Amino acid sequence: MTRCIVLGRFQPFHLGHARLVEAAVNHADGDEVVVAIGSAQAGWEANNPWTAEERQAMVEAWANSTGNNVTVVLIDDINDPPNWVEHAATTHGDGRLVTSDGPTAELYRAAGWEVHDVALSERETLEGWRVRQSVRMLSTVMDDEAARTVLAASVPEAVIEWLIQNDAMFRCSTFESGVHAG
C-alpha cells in the first residue's frame, strides 16, 4: 500500500485528470489518494475560470460517480519552483507523487520524493486550455444536450453535469484574454 498524491490545477477536471487519478487509485492499492488542487487562490480569470472550491466540487462529483475514494486538498501557488515541493507537502503530506507532468516530477524527485510516472493520455485533446476553449465556445449556447455531446469527448459526465447544474460555463464567455497553452 502506498499513499499517493496527484497534483494539478484541474481547470476543469477532465478525462486526462480522471485517468491520472484512476492510475493513482490503482497504484495506492487501497491506501489514501490525495488530489491536491494547486493555484487555489486563482479563479474567475481566463486561464483559471473556476475557484478552488468549485474545482474541488468537480473532483468530488467525479469521485462520487465512479466510487473512487479520494481526499481533496487546496494549495495556494507561491510561484517559487525551488520551494514548491516543501510548500505543497505541508498541505498534501507525505506519499508518492503520481504525475504525467515532467517538470513537476523533476521537482519532486529533486526533493527526494518517489514519483510514479503515468503516460499522457490523448494529450492533443486533453490539454486544459483546449478543454477551457471548448467550454468557452459552449458558454453562450443555451442547449444542455449540445454541451453534453461536445464536452463528452474530454470531460467526465459527472463534471459536465456539475458545470451545467451550477451554471459554471457562462463566465468563460466574459473573459477577454487570449488562449494560454499550459
What are these regions (language model features)?
Residues 1-182:
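Nucleotidyltransferase catalytic core that binds NTPs
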